Amino acid sequence: MDPHPLTWALVLLGPALALSRAPAPAQEAPEKLCGHHFVRALVRLCGGPRWSPEDGRAVAGGDRELLQWLEGQHLFHGLMASGDPMLVLAPQPPPQASGHHHHRRAAATNPARHCCLSGCTRQDLLTLCPH
């Protein structure tokens, strides 16, 4: 029997066997992120328009610009629903009886509200990045 095929088989199958025996990566636990914590996590992962750490502006001023950017992504209502008083820019309209079910459905599908109530993983937040 020729030893070369056995050697090649071990060389080719060795790494595959080693990888199959390696422990599976631990699944990331969802983290509850509400209000400005949610905004900051998004900025940390995605960045924002004209927003960078090198910018000389105060961080507090950047939140308003970020909220305007997120408003286009339909996340603003979820931030307001989280109850963070620092992020509420305008009074909310009074609830209407006819739109109650629509409001509940919109809140259930809102990513900001979902991250606040149930938690989000890093991968969940990356799906919200505009780029």
From Swiss-Prot:
Expressed exclusively in prenatal and postnatal Leydig cells. GO terms for molecular function: hormone activity; protease binding. Its main location: secreted. Disulfide bonds join 34-116, 46-129, 115-120. Residues 1-26 form the signal peptide. One of its GO terms (cellular component) is extracellular space. Keywords: Cleavage on pair of basic residues, Disulfide bond, Hormone, Secreted, Signal. It is found in: Secreted. This is Insulin-like 3. Heterodimer of a B chain and an A chain linked by two disulfide bonds. Seems to play a role in testicular function. May be a trophic hormone with a role in testicular descent in fetal life. Is a ligand for LGR8 receptor. Belongs to the insulin family. The keyword Signal applies. The keyword Signal applies. One of its GO terms (biological process) is adenylate cyclase-inhibiting G protein-coupled receptor signaling pathway. Residues 58-103 form a propeptide.
